[in-house]
Regions:
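Acceptor-substrate binding/catalytic loop of class I
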Residues: 156-173
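A SAM-dependent methyltransferase catalytic signature shared across enzymes that methylate proteins
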Residues: 172-189
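Short, flexible, mixed-charge acidic loops at enzyme active sites
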Residues: 145-153, 198-202
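Conserved beta-strand signature within the Rossmann-like core of class I S-adenosyl-L-methionine
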Residues: 130-136
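A structural helix-start
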Residues: 112-116, 136, 140
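Short catalytic micro-motifs in class I SAM-dependent methyltransferases
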Residues: 106-111
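Conserved N-terminal segment of class I S-adenosyl-L-methionine
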Residues: 1-98, 102-104, 116-119, 134, ...
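A short glycine-rich, Lys/Arg-flanked "PGG" loop and its adjoining helix->strand segment in the class I
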Residues: 116-128
Length: 230
């Protein structure tokens, strides 16, 4: 195999390993943010995977058009009104600049090789005043920090998560990456669903009656940023 063929095969394998889906709590968090911000217009689901979030967003009847893009083929149950593009998201996307009012990306950036290139791509694809919402593992939770201390890696970046998860980001990394791409300072929202170290099926929220939440007690975070009007 050539280097390009080998890389393509590696990326496809990583995509297959990931399964192309996220948790219901993450999808719900996206829906809540979209409703709170009253976002409308043309939406891009960047890294749409098996289309679970794409289909849920369509049922909201908020958007004039929805486009899904992923290395995976178009799911058979995707509505014909949704445009689907099969594309390796590590590569430059051949879409016109300023095509979308909203970009969502659920648990995708940690799968990609160059988050800075991705942020620049998002910025170019958004219209002025457009909104970016993406999620990624929260590497600053107690569960993840303890894993780093005891095992030498964040909890979502163990050998069992590889080669799907390859890019671990902290809030400071995200702030810098988005700033370099000229986005507004990001806001962070936490899913408030988080496993207890060594007992991941037990959640802090259940144990504490919902009192424990936020950065130390959430497995995932959402990032909200805007493209300035000028």
């Amino acid at each position: 195999l050539s280097i390009n063929q080998s890389l393509k095969a590696q990326r496809q394998f990583a995509s297959d390993v990931s399964g192309g889906r996220s948790s219901q709590s993450i999808y719900t968090a996206f829906e809540q943010v979209l409703a709170q911000l009253d976002l409308k217009g043309d939406l891009l689901d960047f890294g749409a995977g098996t289309g679970n979030l794409t289909k849920r967003l369509q049922t909201l009847n908020r958007f004039s058009s929805i486009t899904g893009i992923d290395i995976m083929q178009c799911p058979v149950d995707i509505d014909n009104s949704i445009r689907w593009i099969t594309w390796d998201l590590n590569d430059k996307i051949h879409l016109p600049n300023q095509s979308f009012d909203v970009i969502v990306s659920a648990e995708v950036i940690e799968h990609l090789e160059n988050p800075r290139a991705v942020a620049r791509e998002w910025f170019q694809l958004l219209r002025p005043g457009g909104t970016l919402i993406f999620s990624t593992p929260n590497n600053e939770s107690w569960r993840s920090l303890i894993a780093l201390l005891l095992r030498g890696h964040f909890v979502a970046f163990s050998d069992t998560c590889y080669p799907a998860h390859i890019t671990a980001l902290l809030r400071k990394d995200i702030q810098r990456i988005l700033s370099e791409a000229n986005f507004s300072p990001p806001k962070f929202v936490f899913t408030n669903v988080g496993g207890i170290p060594n007992f991941p099926k037990l959640q802090w929220q259940t144990f504490s009656g919902g009192l424990l939440k936020g950065i130390r007690y959430s497995d995932n975070l959402l990032v909200i940023a805007h493209k300035p009007m000028s």
